[in-house]
Amino acid sequence: AGYAAGIVRPSFGSTSVDYDFKPFGNLRLIHITDTHAQLDPMYFREPNFNLGVGSNRNMPPHIIGKKLLDYYSIDSTLLKHAYTHLEFNKHARKYGKFGGYTHLKTLIDLLKSQVNNNALLLDGGDTWQGSGLSYLENGRDMVEASNLLGVDVMTGHWEFTFGEKIFLDNLKIFNGDFVAQNISLTEEALFEGLEPIDEDNHFQNPYIIKIINGSRVAVIGQSFPYT
């Protein structure tokens, strides 16, 4: 949600997007995902083809274009551009680029300040991998970017493609907590001496309990698929 909110140019967003959300409840959950190591704003086009298999066919998240708009009853031109490929060139000229970590940081800090910092910033992964720089830096640059954003808890997706050693090295400099309930060590990994987190042989903690504004909040990690 935080990433989608950054799709507009400052001139458009300053007059057309209201970020003055009234606080409710004990805390605020802020979620970002799939920034793919893109630190600068960029043009992004949703796919015009997505094929679900079996019972997932023609079901979210495997519906696109007009089917998606009809399924969720979306008639906003802005959301149409954010979530589909329809009339991309036309709307891209109007709304500008997506994302950008400076934009994200500004928005996240605003959303936190509205609730006296009683908030958790969650990251669904696909964050540390995806750019030429992150490839050269083995994702370390993006770990540092995550720390600057103030990510509290994240799970993984393409972060694992750097390999076990680099991934674990990156976790050492990550200031947040990494959780993944669906990743366990294989017999081969155990034989080679890699230590599991618990008796169920989890690679990392499956969940974590955070105490925010007097409330206990459980965050369960679900790595790919369906992060």
Segments from the language model and where they lie:
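N-terminal catalytic scaffold of extracellular/periplasmic and nuclease hydrolases
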Residues: 4-227
